[in-house]
């Protein structure tokens, strides 16, 4: 190579691999009100200092890459970079710590959970310098949350649409979840709704299979709920699952549901994706449809304590993306969920302002500035004996959903629904009279069986059913 064409690595900028902490670990940084804040549980590889691991997370989830590049000089890294501003040990864990990272707002597209997650929970989770990484919480500033529509309607508007106040709403997932014909499926819906439930539900894996195509199911379910409404004088709903293989097909199903005049549709927001979910949520607000959200696939993401993402983050993301209901565990049923942690993210779904409370897993104060709330849905392995605890734990603004706990009644679906309705109203009345459901719940249920043979039969069937396993989602 001639001297005239020879280049040197030292010309222009200093190339090579740098320690992340030199640029991205900034313990002196004062966070701004507009920053998005993240709390990561970090498990570094042996020999990697905590400061370097925390800085690597900040770098790889914002502006950094593995080497210095000359185009760094064409922008202001100081303006756009993520910053690891604090590190604290995890009690009882020698090799883990919490890294707090602040991201400037300009890194994220307005109104896009998809873009937010692509950065914050993207490639950094496969970074070799880390043995494991878990996103425990996010602080979404009002400057960013106001760029989202949020839930299509919210809790108060839903109650006004249904004309139902002062108690939790009751639901039921139709079983068997797969295999029924559309007409038999509609028959099961009708029996549950006329028996006293407010809602019935498609199971999350019911889309449009050979045994029951979606259009047939929609028609028979609409017929069932209109018939039940006429008989009971109450507004009824069935969560028609619009989830599909393409956004176009999903929207076609939502449009048909609206044409049928039903009050609510459903989406599997994690398997369907945030882009599809936000699209559907916007349509639901514009067209007066409530939107029920199922969280199928969440445990793949959130169940491991050391890696992935806590459900409280997925709950915040759903509130921004849009949904009027979301499944949130039961505390007392067959699915994972510790009480204080569960109530922490239930408050994040429902309330306007939630204070930092590490005892409930809430790492940051969250201000939703009047974004509509989401009703938490308790579903999975629950029955009439759980009703006092569910009423006491979740309060009025919730949906209590009994699938097997309705359809497993020895006398059929309608008596199963009646048993749940009687149990709920007995618990609400007892609570309103000042009785302690935590201590007197079983007595309240037994008293109600005296004037409800349906409830008495249900109590006899499920008196021995318990799911007593230790939770792994603890603080």
UniProtKB/Swiss-Prot annotation:
The modification N-acetylproline is found at residue 3. Its EC number is 4.1.1.39. The modification N6,N6,N6-trimethyllysine is found at residue 14. Its main location: plastid. Residues 1-2 form a propeptide. Pfam families: RuBisCO_large (PF00016), RuBisCO_large_N (PF02788). The modification N6-carboxylysine is found at residue 201. The basic functional RuBisCO is composed of a large chain homodimer in a 'head-to-tail' conformation. In form I RuBisCO this homodimer is arranged in a barrel-like tetramer with the small subunits forming a tetrameric 'cap' on each end of the 'barrel'. This is Ribulose bisphosphate carboxylase large chain.
